[in-house]
Amino acid sequence: MTVGVLGSGTVGQDVLNLIQKRKHIFDDIGVNIEIAGVLVRDVQKKRNIPDGIRVTDTCDFLQECGVVIETMGGVDRPLEILHPYLRSHRSVITANKALLAERWDVLREYALDGNLYYEASVMAGTPVIGPMSTVLRASTFTRLQAVLNGTCNYILTQMEGGKEYAQALAEAQALGYAEDPPTLDVGGFDTAHKLTVMARFCADGNFPYSAVEVQGIEGLTLADIEDARKNGEKYKLVAELERHGSGWKATVAPKRLPETHALCTAGASRNALVYEGEECGTLIFAGGGAGGMITASAMVGDLLDYLLGFPGHVPLH
């Protein structure tokens, strides 16, 4: 099977190394993985990838590929590359929640056909998209709450220790946790992208990103954090989806939760999701929600599903 990779940042490099490391799982199903090429911006840059892999700044190798793994990030450029490829009835594996959330007008038909695999788009290697697209469909969805952004988790944890917001944010940026500018994270938009993706499995298969009400953590003060602590509570940036009249209400906002709440006890560096259904009851998912190798593990898992003949993650119709 010939595979193409778009992007060679941390995630792209880890995908390539994990495919090599886990070669035996592909051998077990009788498949030999050949990397046709890796699309990059700078071919001269040093990278931690297996020897012998073609690195290029052109997309001509896509014609050879049975499946493409997209790790570029962004919206316009990956869509420009992937749309013609998807039109040729071939499959794409991606972790790109912004692309999925914002350009569903283009991508939905390919997802409905089973040609989009995107487990890693929400909570990275902690599996939530797979269960939502399969086993949880048997249960009537009622509500979800989730903490989905590691940068906000880090900043709020530092503020609990007495650091001002600006200082905690600067540290997060210095450590590489937050982008510069960090609005996508601290403004709640990264979380809103992920909530939009999940909503299409449990509420409305055409749920629009524009329907999410978004408020970030920029306005929180040490006084807010301390007042919550005195009352046995913590602030978290919470994504929430629940029934509202005949439709659905989706929000992202800072919320005070009891310290014993599952979203608080999951750990400062972990994502968490509380999923509620009439028949399945309350389910809790928790684990790493960011990082190169954990994201790569979900993407390589999607590759294995593709090779085994399983369809991609099909939303509600």
Could you tell me what each predicted segment is?
Residues R22-N48:
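NAD(P)-binding Rossmann-fold cofactor-contacting core
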Residues L112-E179, D185-D190, V197:
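Rossmann-like NAD(P)H-binding beta-loop-alpha module
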Residues G12-Q13:
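N-terminal Rossmann-fold NAD(P) dinucleotide-binding loop
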Residues S8:
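Glycine-rich Rossmann-fold phosphate-binding loop(s) that bind the pyrophosphate
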Residues A262-H317:
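ATP-dependent carboxylate/acyl-activation modules
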Residues P78-S88, A95-A124, I129-M132:
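Rossmann-fold NAD(P)-binding glycine/threonine-rich loop
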Residues Q158, L169-T265, R270:
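Substrate-binding/catalytic subdomain of NAD(P)-dependent oxidoreductase enzymes
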